[in-house]
């Protein structure tokens, strides 16, 4: 990816309760082996000199303390004014950004480089549907339907979003996201609602 871009890492909520034996931590500073999640994610982008915005809310002070040595011109921790859904968090992050963005969920470490893929992109894998993840249908590379953490009574294999997305036209995506956040769709997170319509 030759153009400048911004990396957005949403980390507004604490890790799930079953992972809190190490403390009530946001995913971005959750320990993995001898590092934290941030170290693994940042390794994917540091040689590209991309700016990184980490968006926090719950225990944001812990994130600021843990990352104080790396926060600077290229890496910023931004605090949400209030907590809503993922779509609101990402809208807040891209509100004044016009360059392309990579959205990398704080709990997602993918060793493949999404920046080497041309155009809009996201990573996915196939698995049996569960209400834990967000799945989708696609036709010829176009997302046609999204199942956001829907309960299912039968074993059906679908594609699921892994948590790394690249958006080239940030302006258009921001407008879709703004509409999705304002609609407050109760069946689907506004981020996925916008993805389905962009």
Where are these regions (language model features)?
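Conserved core of the sugar-phosphate nucleotidyltransferase
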Residues: 109-185
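Short beta-strand-to-loop acidic/aromatic patch adjacent to the donor-nucleotide binding site
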Residues: 99-109
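Catalytic core and acceptor-binding pocket of nucleotide-sugar-dependent glycosyltransferases
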Residues: 180-198
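Short glycine-/acidic-enriched loop or helix-start segments at secondary-structure transitions
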Residues: 18-20, 63-66, 89, 112-115, ...
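Structural motif
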Residues: 10-13, 55-59, 105-107, 125-127, ...
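Short, conserved catalytic or adaptor-binding loops enriched in Gly and charged residues
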Residues: 67-71, 137-138, 196-198
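Short alpha-helical oligomerization interface
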Residues: 23-27
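Conserved N-terminal catalytic core of the sugar/cofactor nucleotidyltransferase
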Residues: 1-18, 30-31, 35-100, 183
